[in-house]
Amino acid sequence: MPSLRAHVFRVPADGPDDVAGVEALFASGLQANNIVAVLGKTEGNGCVNDFTRGYATRSFETLFSRYGVDGVSIIMSGGTEGALSPHWTVFARETVETPGERALAIGVSRTPALSPEHLGRREQILLVAEGVKSAMRDAGIDDPADAHFVQIKCPLLTSRRIAEAEAAGRTVATHDTLKSMGLSRGASALGVAVALGEIDATSINDADICTRFDLFSRCASTSSGVELTDHEIIVLGMSAKWSGPLSIDHAVMRDAIDAHSVRKARERLPENSRLAAVLAKAEPDPSGEIDGRRHTMLDDSDIAGTRHARAFVGGVLAGIFGITDLYVSGGAEHQGPPGGGPVAIIVEKEQ
């Protein structure tokens, strides 16, 4: 009985347009049409005017077009503060003549475009929830408990998008383009929570988004960008329909220094295994404290708090895993408890 098999590659990047390492994978035998997703960390500021994300996305679209490949989910997260290293994480899958044995599963989907007036509102939550369910079906994940990380690239509001909506007689959730990033991330994360049964959709209203932080998903990782108007969704989990040496588990950090939870998740994975990728969310604790001690990430007028958080949590995780090419995305609204966030660990068992 055939099964699906996943492959994960961590590739260094010298800049947002550096796809040479991925092209080298093709030269070494990776079939370009087996790639389903690319997660990237680019060296921009991670804010509204971070065009490194779009630059990197266009670079990959150009690369894939040369190989006649389309439909790859390309999700770029800006910001490599501290010692975080710019890199790409490439996900591929293929059909093999091996019975399924419960291994890493990858599913992708893309939603219809989101109208600007629906950003940061219930409509976005429900749209994302349907997209996550579609990606789970694509991955062959039947039980929401088997989903360990849901990565979403979501849109934001720009001055032009706001003006177009208001010219049509519609109102938007905010006129602050930076705030729109958080609203979009938060609504998308709540969509994940609805899809996974963590939250009942009927219990959420517009006013809860980015205010009721007791509502959150333990698996969501959302990143907003100017380069799209829809949502690109990648679901990572475990499925008996897949085979191969890759496994995934996740932790939920209760705060930015919760190394214990991350280590416990690593211990649940095969002991003699190679680290394939680490994917995480980070945000400044909105209380202004970490474990009872004051932090100043939210008071810095020069550097956005999400940038501080990426650097800080990146350092914690680098100390645990001994690598700096970590996918640490800032802004964790409704993604884990306030000040914390999910961390997914992918390993490859020895064969």
From Swiss-Prot:
Catalytic activity, EC: 3.5.2.15
RU C: annotated segments: 246-351
Known regulation of activity: Inhibited by barbituric acid.
Gene3D superfamilies, A to Z: Cyanuric acid hydrolase/Barbituras, RU C, Cyanuric acid hydrolase/Barbiturase, RU A, Cyanuric acid hydrolase/Barbiturase, RU B
UniProt site (Important for substrate specificity): T306
Entry-linked InterPro entries: AtzD/Barbiturase, AtzD/Barbiturase_RUA, AtzD/Barbiturase_RUB, AtzD/Barbiturase_RUC
NCBIfam families per record: amido_AtzD_TrzD
UniProt xrefs under HAMAP family: Cyc_amidohydrol
Domain notes: The monomer structure is formed from three repeating units (RUs) that share the same structure as one another. The monomer, the active site and substrate all possess threefold rotational symmetry, to the extent that the active site possesses three potential Ser-Lys catalytic dyads. It is possible that any or all of the three active-site serines may act as nucleophile (albeit only one can do so per catalytic cycle).
Protein name in the entry: Cyanuric acid amidohydrolase
Organism: Rhizobium johnstonii (strain DSM 114642 / LMG 32736 / 3841) (Rhizobium leguminosarum bv. viciae)
